[in-house]
Structures are given as structure tokens and as C-alpha cells.
Amino acid sequence: MSCFDLCRPCGPTPLANSCNEACVRQCQDSRVVIQPSPVVVTLPGPILSSFPQNTLVGSSTSAAVGSILSEEGVPISSGGFGISGLGSRFSGRRCLPC
């Protein structure tokens, strides 16, 4: 690092090396790169809202419960004859309930 001497001479060279003026020495500027430290930013999460509604859903047809269906009040079991048996029983009639 080099410095510049800004002291002025005190006039004619005295026999005793003394001076009453201030003497300042200035050095070159220093450059320092400061990396920013990691910053943690917390973003708020989404706000989930629900609006529950009490709704009744009904049907006028019979519902399937387990493996037993009802056709005109007579219980039908799917065990033994499978879907093909249901098809032959209801062929030509109305659709099966959903």
C-alpha cells in the first residue's frame, strides 16, 4: 500500500527539525466486498376455508347394500350365479338401480 505524504515543508530548513503545522498522511482507498448474509424469508401459507352444508340426498329406488339387491321386494344374492344371472333375470325389464 502506498501512501502520499501531504506534509508541507515548514519553510527554510531549520537547524532544529521542528514544525508547528499539522502533518497528515493519506493512503489509497481500500475496496472491500461484503457479501450479504443469508436471509430467511417466511412466506405465509395459503388459508384454506370450507363452507360445510347440510344436504340430504335421497332416492326413490332401492339401494344396493353389500351383495344383496332387491327387485320388487324379493332379495337377490349375487353369490353363485354372478352378473350373468342378474342379466337373465332382468332381461326385458327395467334397468338396474344405480
From Swiss-Prot:
Lineage top rank: taxon: Eukaryota
The UniProt entry, under InterPro entries, shows: Keratin
Query: A GO molecular-function term, please?
Result: structural constituent of cytoskeleton
Q: Which Pfam families match?
A: Keratin (PF02422)
Q: Tell me how this protein assembles.
A: The avian keratins (F-ker, S-ker, C-ker and B-ker) are a complex mixture of very similar polypeptides.
Entry's family note: Belongs to the avian keratin family.
Q: What is this protein called?
A: Feather keratin 3
- Organism the protein comes from: Gallus gallus (Chicken)
